[in-house]
Amino acid sequence: MEKQQFVVIAYDGTDADALNRRMNAREAHLENIRTMKAEGSFIEGGAILNDNGQMIGSVVFVSFTSRQELDTWLAADPYVTGNVWQKIEVKPFRCVKL
């Protein structure tokens, strides 16, 4: 089955403990992303920063066989289970081929 590409835009909470939750879940989240990269599901991504350079969210480009598969990944990601990402937008996406 052909994979579909998606962009995930996720915003962290804005409470005083938000950055601590992110940092506590970060290594597990990155390990998950490394596995996805090896499996071909992770395209690119990184942190959204505020004007002071503090991480306040993430943008992730991924490819899955279905939206359901993407939702399964999201539900298990440490940034979701660790209550880091508070608002998540998912949109279909297509990488330009240069």
Each language-model region and where it sits:
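Conserved, structured core segments of small domains
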Residues: 1-98
